[in-house]
Amino acid sequence: MDHAAAQLEKQHVHDVYESTAPYFSDLQSKAWPRVRQFLQEQKPGSLIADIGCGTGKYLKVNSQVHTLGCDYCAPLVEIARSRGCEVMVCDNLNLPFRDQGFDAIISIGVIHHFSTKQRRIRAIKEMARVLVPGGQLMIYVWAMEQKNRHFEKQDVLVPWNKALCSQRLSESGQPGRKQECGHPERGYPYHPACSACHCSVCFEGRCNSKRSHSVDCDSVLAGTCCANISKEGEEENGFYNTLGKSFRSWFSSRSLDESTLRKQIEKVRPLKSTESWANSAISIQPSRHSSFDLGHPETLSAGEQNLDEEVFVEPSQGPREWLRAPTTCKQLNGDHPGVIRRNGDGNFLGGANAKESCVDEGNLEEGTASGSKLWRRISAADSTDSNPGDAISVEEQQPDVLDSRAFMRYYHVFREGELCGLLKESVSELHILSSGNDHGNWCVIAEKRESCD
């Protein structure tokens, strides 16, 4: 199972970040306030590690400490290095540092990219290993409990949209200021694909479910970013707040039942076959107001009544080259990134609940291109757990729809208390100092005990 998880993590996190990294080279964002505060509270001269540093936006927050960033994604590391940061490529599951070497560590949006509980524990324990006794560790992960976003499952796929990275930020009224795509200043820290870039996802549900779709990813099919940017917000952070509301309509994942999804499909018909879109292996759906990496509770715009309709507009008549994924995103088995297959026994990552009625389409990691069908996830109406269920095969989809799956990233969204429970039960060397919800994320600050066996 660990090998299968690693392979899927490579496909749905590592490869995605490596392919999209060039779009971040000219984009920047400020450090998120609570993370900035944590870093500034560290003693002068402290040695701090940012595990999953991405482009390095937290590495220069405090000039009185020495910071070292590391990330699994080499292209992101190169961007951080070009900005004068001290960085290196490494794996969160096997950090190349000696024991008790760092005074503080931050892990912002990394742990939720690990596909199994065991791998999440290993990543946290590895950070605890290199932390000095009395040192502090800050962890941010996506929260399942959010005001304006609903998850049916804890394991979801979230799309990355190239179109938004190309959008001119000058439209917001403050030209010359830059920010990372999908990462507004407040409430949206960049969630890099560090070692924690591991991803396996529950694509399957129960065959006897009354719902025909469980959608965990938002739509990347519309031709333009259609959300109206609100002018509300504080003067200092208004730019990032309002721009973030535009992004949130694209970078989110929530669930819709079949009837709601069909209504949205009827409103928008930019593709040749909307039926094939609705039956896609990873059902893509319109979203309300959520972030790229952090769910923000604010609405998209104060005067909008129907937020679902806002994210659908008539596409422009121009070409949609951005819908097509680069050839570098071809998957391990040679298929399109959106083609999800199961292993030989018909289970996803060794799941034990598969039914005989579910047809096997070849090995998940080592399968050839001979399989011609996709697997559509069907989840039970009230299911919110991440246990794999069953799947049914559906017709092969349009190439453009398959290509749009190239940038689907895996997230394990944490329930309330799950992260704290993980530390208390499995990482005894850490003592929790504080925990809470911060803009759709669970944040935990823990301290390494003075005496650890």
UniProtKB/Swiss-Prot annotation:
It is an enzyme of class 2 (transferase). The modification Phosphoserine is found at S214. The keyword Repeat does not apply. GO terms for molecular function: S-adenosylmethionine-dependent methyltransferase activity; tRNA (5-carboxymethyluridine(34)-5-O)-methyltransferase activity; tRNA binding. SUPFAM superfamilies: S-adenosyl-L-methionine-dependent methyltransferases (SSF53335). One of its GO terms (cellular component) is nucleus. Its EC number is 2.1.1.-. This is Probable tRNA methyltransferase 9B.
